[in-house]
């Protein structure tokens, strides 16, 4: 398990990826970085589903695909995935299949969150793998970025934290 400083460091990295996805591609600002047990970046990315016309190109999937290519392995054992928004069911199940060790997320997703908000797929005893979960790391910052993105898309003024 990493310490609070490491979790915040990597979450800030994920927030920067989310901001880049928003600024460069007008994507929903979600960023993810997959880190090895010894602190090496294995894969990272922001949401790409709008720009690539791919409903599966969520930030988590982008990061896991990059890590799988880098390691030449579909198993990502012992890794930690940092993501700015609680994963959906698709991403959560991909994490289980990849054998991710730990998930750290920023903002909860009360509509589609699958790490405890709506569903709790990651600790379901029916699966052959469980993932340690820590939520709320820099959650206010991530939530603010997401709310302002959607406010701007709806033609409303953004809100300063």
Where are the regions that the model predicts?
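Zinc-dependent deaminase
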Residues: 1-21, 90-161
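Short loop/turn motifs at secondary-structure junctions and domain boundaries
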Residues: 23-26
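Short beta-strand scaffold segments in enzyme catalytic cores
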Residues: 30-39
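A short, polar/charged loop-to-alpha-helix boundary motif
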Residues: 51-62, 66
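Immediate flanking context of iron-sulfur cluster ligation sites
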Residues: 73-85
């Amino acid at each position: 398990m990493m310490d609070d400083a490491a979790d915040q460091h990597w979450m800030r990295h994920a927030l920067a990826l989310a901001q880049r996805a928003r600024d460069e591609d007008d994507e929903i600002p979600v960023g993810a970085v997959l880190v090895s047990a010894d602190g090496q970046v294995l894969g990272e990315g922001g949401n790409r589903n709008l720009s690539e016309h791919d409903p599966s190109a969520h930030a988590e999937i982008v990061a896991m695909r990059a890590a799988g290519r880098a390691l030449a392995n579909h198993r990502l054992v012992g890794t930690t995935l940092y993501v700015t928004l609680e994963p959906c069911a698709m991403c959560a199940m991909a994490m289980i299949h990849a054998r991710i060790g730990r998930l750290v997320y920023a903002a909860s997703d009360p509509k589609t969150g699958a790490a405890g908000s709506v569903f709790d797929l990651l600790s379901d005893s029916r699966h052959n793998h469980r993932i340690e979960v820590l939520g709320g790391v820099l959650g206010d910052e991530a939530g603010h970025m997401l709310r302002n993105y959607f406010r701007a898309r709806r033609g409303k003024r953004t809100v300063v934290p």
